[in-house]
Amino acid sequence: MERAKVDFLRAASHELKTPVTALNATLENMILGVGKYQNYATYLPECKEMVEQLSGMIHEILETSKLNLTAEAPKQVDVSELLAELCEPYQLIAAAHQIMFSLDLPEQFPATLPAGPFSKAVSNVLANAVAYTEAGKVVSVYMEGRSLVVENECQPIPDDEIRRLFEPFYRPDFSRSRESGGNGLGLYIVNTLLTSMNIPYSFAPMKSPPGMCFTIQL
């Protein structure tokens, strides 16, 4: 556990270094009046945007660093009801990007689990699925036996890349850039939470239709 914390903090420090360096260089050039940086009207808004990105990153890092600090007691929940609530915002996001979102749940699905951490883990799985699905493709959420399945149609990810996706701040070549919202923490958070709850999961490519399938065993 301590090694994992050290690795996370090392990765976080490295991740923050680049935007801090860029912001410092931009401000320094503005102060010195170097070339194009004399145009404050252009570069002050850019600096503000960098600060907002840094603020968001720091918030995510702090929230992620606290994942293992508290333990929520398991309780009886209706997973179907919980999933319907969790999926609602992602259905709206999907619709806005012309992505079809299929939700097929039983009327009730009782389970005993920590609702807060489980909800956060599933939300990150859903966010990841919608983020990497192109317009005209489908995200499907359904129960299969005692398993929650989240599928999204996309270019399947190679096995050697899948393992690294659960490392903090890892972004493969096909991943979105930081500017478009990806921070490389989503699946790291999923792994941390599900592992802490002793909930098995798998993340594997699909052949037909091509895509990825995230399965959580309840």
Tell me what each language-model feature is.
Residues A129-V130:
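Short helix-loop "hinge" at the ATP-lid/N-box region of the Bergerat-fold HATPase_c
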Residues A95, M100-P110:
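Conserved catalytic submotifs in the C-terminal HATPase_c
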Residues I157-R171:
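Short conserved segment of the HATPase_c
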Residues N68-K75, P110-A115:
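Conserved micro-motifs of the catalytic ATP-binding
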Residues P45-L54:
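Short alpha-helical segment of the dimerization/phosphotransfer core of two-component systems
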Residues N198-M206:
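Glycine-rich ATP-binding loops of the HATPase_c
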Residues G136-S147:
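Short beta-strand/loop element within the Bergerat-fold HATPase_c
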